[in-house]
């Protein structure tokens, strides 16, 4: 049937901030859906709270609302915009939950739910309804019982037994779920699961741990035509969330009759659900038998992987199906000549490996279960499974420990952590047999054989190998440097022997039809499919897997750079290995390389064609770290390709503390007393000279990794043992810590002669909390015109002094009206998307044009003057990571960001808090606990909260000095003083907000239980007095006036 004529305007709900379980894949799918709908002449209204997304760009939708994703707010937008339909399946779990809530509150009268019908949401997400549907259609499910209260636990154990799996309804990434092996463990998981579930429901399910886990991505249209887009198989068995698993596509270990049985079951289920669009179905499989585990009646993380693995644009097709088009009416935009009803065929093997945040969270529980903990993932493509495994291993940018202790290896293999995939290789190196490893892990022997092949070849290479072994190593995906290290030969010698790789095309049809959107991977089989031409080309280095410190913001910058260069007629190629992102969409760039982001791989790509230049400054710290070695490698090979924009030497000046200090001295710009040290003794001497407390950090890292404020020599010595390991080739940087200073971030573009300031952001938290974790505001709220003028002057001096061409981010601190420079980063920063959305200045696009020679004076942009207030707030991952210190400090911990925008600071901050799942209460009890050094500062905040009608509670010391100041507060016992205490009040829902500001390590330990409980019971919490002051302003504002609901374009006009 042709597209529906009654659907003229569609509301699309985004997924909100990046978080564990819901990352960039929904920006990728949402952006694709927006473009797909607009191609059909549909007016698109988009709601999302995340400014760091491509989908919230002005050209992606007709009306864009950057607002909290709350049903009551979206209901008002629906009332205002009056859409004909709502597309919920592109916004992940958030989108489905909101659609269900909107329907239940009656806000969707006259608005049709497109693609995924409401009943399919209920049957897919409500565990009891899903189980009943599967039983009704004769599809086997694990034995299970639905719980709504803790009192049903014993009944569940009697019927299901232990261990048992807990699956909460309507949650994301398995949040609140897990595997209970004892009654106590099961009770704890169920209590958490019930609190996290939208409908207060969990399913207790018999364990099928150790079975194979299989996934099918299915597409269905309104005429009941179904296709399997991709089949996927988890290397890790059941018991580990698929988002935490190493995944292989296509399925390799089923016989054809078994595969056809599973294919038929997947199609049977999507038909029963009546989903029109995409659907992800997960199965457990063992010895010819299977169980249906769950269904995602929406685009998911697995959908993004399936889309990138096959080249099939799932979200684009699903959006068109939602407005009535049939699969055979939709053109496959990759081939340009086949219909979307053709099932994709692939002649290569794809491997996905997750990226975990444990390099940031040393104390976190690293055990992998049915609840997600990873922040991102990499994807690798090869012609053999060995090759894909090795390319994926090289793509994960984590320091991997080698395990040699047999007992330690057994423990990791049997109780899996994030180290298990790498530990499989260690086990074979230490002489474990295949049967032993299979017994410990329940991993299919087929996968273990491939890993054993790799390790056996490593041993041959190290023992004195033949040239044939080296050729085999290349077919297995070894890098030249890895072969050189094993054989003792030089990397150049290896390269001369093996030559260059071939580049093959991903085309959805195993080369049966020509592809019109080139998308390549390297391999050692056959001839290259790249056709060289004379066009001017630029390669942009992407940002790799999403991790804390390097998130979706850098992909945003990459995509903007591509758009800018294409506007100037330049052919743009991207190299990246992240399957979740817009930059790796099939039509973002002129040519896409899905490859590891390492020097050898990037150099190989540059040798495939005549490249004019490479851009490194949009891909975050990893790409910037490649600048100097890549420049050297290009010169060594005599290649004409240049590093475009700011020179690698200027980047080095900014990173090298001594060189940067010389520059600041020359420019007569103050900075905190600072130095650098290469040893513990030198660090001790320099810190004592500067004076404690000092801020210490390694150089050349992103996200404040291993950064800490240390107060004495003992803390410094403890720190140095970690920091020196993190930064083996660069010094540790030591800065005087400015207490109670206001921190600023400035994003600017420089063309070498002029500087355009994109935005000056004032941090709401004090200096010393990582800028990536601090809420910030545009325009500044507390700085004098004289200070702002100094900030502008210093920004211009530093940008020109460094010789910046492109973007620069400068961090400053203001104390006693003196502006100090903390650091400068001549590259894209994580605040670029926020600045662009808040001001309307597309600074990443401007920077890309400047990098190819355009002048700011010719581009016609000026610093924005805005009437509104925009607040960036962060989302913290503590609800997904047990054992993590919840106190903010100089090391970054947040996974994503949101934006609040209004005409008043208090209202904008209130919106930002709602969006960050930290909704401030307008009534109820507030628990306040601050250290004695902050008692004078907390009194006016406490007084304002009391005057606003909130009731204050605190422990003895805090209550005493509040009473002395005439502020009424109620005493509550400390945890160690027995019950009833603050934890009891939290458990019973009697506390609505926590203000808790520990300063030293001892008070951190004392307050850890309170903050952990706040996370578990979803009570908003504040850990700095600056944020508490802003919260009081926000509560005051929201009590006085209503929030504004306007499209972004109205604020920026």
Swiss-Prot record:
UniProt: ATP 2 binding residues: 697, 736, 738, 743, 768-771, 811, 823
Binding locations of ATP 1: 127, 167, 173-174, 206, 208, 213, 239-241, 282, 294
Gene name linked to the record: carB
Protein name from the UniProt record: Carbamoyl phosphate synthase large chain
Region annotation Carboxyphosphate synthetic domain: where it falls in the sequence: 1-397
Annotated positions binding Mg(2+) 4: 823, 825
Gene Ontology MF term list: ATP binding; carbamoyl-phosphate synthase (ammonia) activity; carbamoyl-phosphate synthase (glutamine-hydrolyzing) activity; metal ion binding
Residues bound to Mg(2+) 2: 294, 296
Residues annotated to bind Mg(2+) 3: 811, 823
Pathway membership, UniProt: Amino-acid biosynthesis; L-arginine biosynthesis; carbamoyl phosphate from bicarbonate: step 1/1; Pyrimidine metabolism; UMP biosynthesis via de novo pathway; (S)-dihydroorotate from bicarbonate: step 1/3
Family: Belongs to the CarB family.
Gene3D superfamilies: 3.40.50.20, ATP-grasp fold, A domain (3.30.1490.20), ATP-grasp fold, B domain (3.30.470.20), Carbamoyl-phosphate synthetase, large subunit oligomerisation domain (1.10.1030.10), Methylglyoxal synthase-like domain (3.40.50.1380)
Residues engaged in binding Mn(2+) 4: 823, 825
Enzyme Commission designation: 6.3.4.16, 6.3.5.5
Keywords attached to this entry: Amino-acid biosynthesis, Arginine biosynthesis, ATP-binding, Ligase, Magnesium, Manganese, Metal-binding, Nucleotide-binding, Pyrimidine biosynthesis, Repeat
Note on cofactor: Binds 4 Mg(2+) or Mn(2+) ions per subunit.
Organism: Methanoregula boonei (strain DSM 21154 / JCM 14090 / 6A8)
């Amino acid at each position: 049937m042709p597209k529906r004529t009654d659907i003229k305007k569609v509301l699309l709900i985004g997924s909100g901030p990046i978080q564990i379980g819901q990352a960039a894949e929904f920006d990728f799918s949402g952006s694709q859906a927006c473009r797909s709908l607009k191609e059909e002449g549909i007016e698109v209204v988009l709601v999302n709270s995340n400014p760091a997304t491509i989908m919230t760009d002005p050209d992606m939708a007709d009306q864009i609302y950057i607002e909290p994703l709350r049903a009551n707010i979206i209901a008002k937008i629906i009332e205002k915009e009056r859409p004909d339909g709502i597309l919920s399946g592109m916004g992940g779990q958030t989108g489905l939950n909101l659609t269900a809530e909107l329907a239940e509150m009656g806000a969707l009268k006259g608005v049709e739910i497109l693609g995924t019908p409401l009943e399919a949401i209920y049957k897919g997400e409500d565990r009891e309804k899903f189980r009943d549907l599967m039983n009704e259609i004769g599809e086997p499910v694990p034995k299970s019982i639905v719980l709504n209260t803790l009192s049903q636990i014993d009944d569940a154990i009697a019927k299901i037994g232990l261990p048992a799996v807990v699956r909460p309804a309507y949650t994301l990434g398995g949040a609140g779920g897990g595997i209970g092996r004892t009654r106590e463990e099961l009770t704890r998981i169920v209590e958490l699961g019930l609190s996290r579930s939208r409908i207060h429901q969990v399913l207790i399910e018999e364990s099928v741990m150790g079975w194979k886990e299989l996934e099918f991505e299915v597409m269905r249209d309104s005429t009941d035509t179904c296709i399997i887009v991709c089949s996927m198989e988890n290397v890790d068995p059941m018991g580990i969330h698929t988002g935490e698993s190493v995944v292989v596509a296509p399925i390799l270990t089923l016989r054809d009759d078994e595969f056809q049985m599973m294919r038929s079951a997947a199609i049977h289920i999507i038909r029963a659900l009546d989903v029109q669009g995409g659907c992800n179905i997960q199965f457990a499989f063992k010895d010819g038998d299977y169980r249906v585990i769950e269904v995602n009646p929406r685009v998911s993380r697995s959908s993004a992987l399936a889309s990138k693995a096959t080249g099939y644009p799932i979200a684009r097709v699903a959006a068109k199906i939602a407005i009535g088009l049939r699969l055979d009416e939709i053109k496959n935009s990759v081939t340009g000549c086949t219909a979307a009803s053709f099932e994709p065929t692939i002649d290569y093997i794809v491997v996905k490996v997750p990226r975990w945040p444990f390099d940031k969270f040393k104390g976190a529980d690293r055990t992998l279960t049915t609840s997600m903990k990873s922040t991102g993932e990499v994807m690798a493509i090869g012609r053999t499974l060995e090759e894909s495994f090795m390319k994926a291993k090289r793509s994960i940018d984590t320091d991997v420990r080698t395990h040699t202790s047999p007992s330690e290896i057994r423990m990791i293999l049997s109780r899996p952590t994030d180290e298990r995939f790498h530990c499989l290789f260690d086990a074979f190196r230490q002489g474990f047999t295949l049967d032993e490893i299979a017994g410990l892990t329940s991993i299919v022997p087929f996968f273990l054989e491939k890993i054993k092949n790799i390790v056996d070849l490593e041993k041959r290479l190290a023992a004195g190998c033949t040239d044939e072994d080296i050729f085999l190593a290349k077919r297995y995906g070894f890098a030249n440097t890895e072969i050189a290290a094993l054989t003792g030969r030089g990397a150049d010698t290896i390269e001369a022997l093996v030559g260059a790789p071939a580049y093959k095309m991903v085309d959805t049809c195993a080369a049966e039809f020509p592809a019109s959107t080139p998308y390549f991977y390297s391999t050692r089989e056959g001839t290259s499919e790249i056709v060289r031409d004379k066009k001017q080309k630029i390669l942009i280095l992407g940002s790799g897997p999403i991790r804390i410190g390097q998130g979706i913001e850098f992909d945003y910058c990459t995509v903007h750079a591509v758009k800018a260069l294409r506007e100037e007629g330049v052919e743009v190629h991207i190299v990246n290995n992240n399957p979740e992102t817009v930059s790796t969409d099939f039509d973002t760039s002129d040519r896409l390389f899905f490859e590891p982001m390492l020097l050898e791989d990037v150099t190989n790509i540059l040798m495939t064609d005549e490249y004019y230049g490479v851009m490194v400054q949009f891909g975050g710290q990893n790409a910037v770290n490649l600048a100097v070695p890549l420049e050297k490698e290009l010169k060594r090979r005599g290649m004409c390709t240049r590093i475009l924009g700011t020179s690698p030497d200027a980047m080095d000046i900014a990173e090298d503390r001594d060189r940067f200090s010389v520059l600041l001295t020359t420019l007569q710009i103050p900075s905190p007393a600072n130095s650098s040290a290469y040893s513990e003794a030198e660090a001790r001497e320099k810190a004592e000279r500067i004076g404690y407390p000092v801020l210490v950090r390694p150089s050349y890292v992103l996200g404040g990794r291993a950064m800490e404020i240390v107060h004495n020599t003992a803390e410094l010595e403890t720190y140095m043992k970690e920091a020196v390991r993190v930064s083996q080739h660069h010094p540790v940087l030591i800065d005087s810590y400015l207490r109670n200073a206001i921190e600023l971030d400035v994003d600017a573009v420089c063309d070498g002669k002029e500087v355009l300031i994109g935005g000056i952001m004032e941090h709401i938290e004090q200096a010393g909390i990582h800028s990536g974790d601090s809420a910030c505001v545009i325009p500044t709220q507390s700085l004098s015109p004289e200070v702002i003028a100094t900030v502008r002057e210093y920004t211009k001096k530093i940008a020109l002094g460094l010789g910046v061409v492109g973007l620069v981010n400068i961090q400053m601190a203001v104390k006693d009206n003196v502006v100090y420079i903390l650091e400068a980063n001549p590259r894209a920063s994580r605040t670029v998307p926020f600045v662009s959305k808040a001001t309307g200045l597309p600074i990443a696009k401007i920077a890309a044009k400047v990098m190819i020679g355009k002048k700011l004076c010719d581009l016609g942009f000026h610093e924005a003057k805005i009437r509104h207030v925009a607040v960036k707030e962060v989302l913290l991952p503590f609800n997904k990571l047990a054992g993590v210190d919840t106190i903010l400090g100089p090391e970054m911990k947040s996974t994503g960001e949101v934006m609040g925008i209004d005409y008043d600071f208090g209202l904008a901050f209130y919106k930002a808090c709602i969006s960050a799942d930290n909704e401030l209460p307008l009534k109820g009890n507030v628990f306040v606990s601050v250290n004695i050094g902050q008692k004078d500062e907390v009194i006016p905040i406490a007084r304002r909260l009391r005057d606003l009608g909130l009731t204050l509670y605190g422990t003895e010391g805090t209550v005493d000095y509040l009473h002395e100041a005439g502020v009424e507060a109620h005493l509550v016992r400390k945890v160690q003083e027995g019950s009833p205490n603050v934890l009891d009040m939290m458990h019973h829902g009697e506390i609505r907000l926590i203000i808790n500001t520990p300063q030293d390590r001892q008070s951190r330990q004392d307050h850890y239980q309170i903050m952990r409980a706040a996370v578990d019971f979803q009570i908003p919490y504040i850990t700095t007095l600056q944020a508490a002051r802003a919260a009081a302003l926000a509560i005051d504002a929201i009590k006085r006036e209503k929030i504004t609901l306007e499209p972004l374009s109205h604020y920026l006009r």
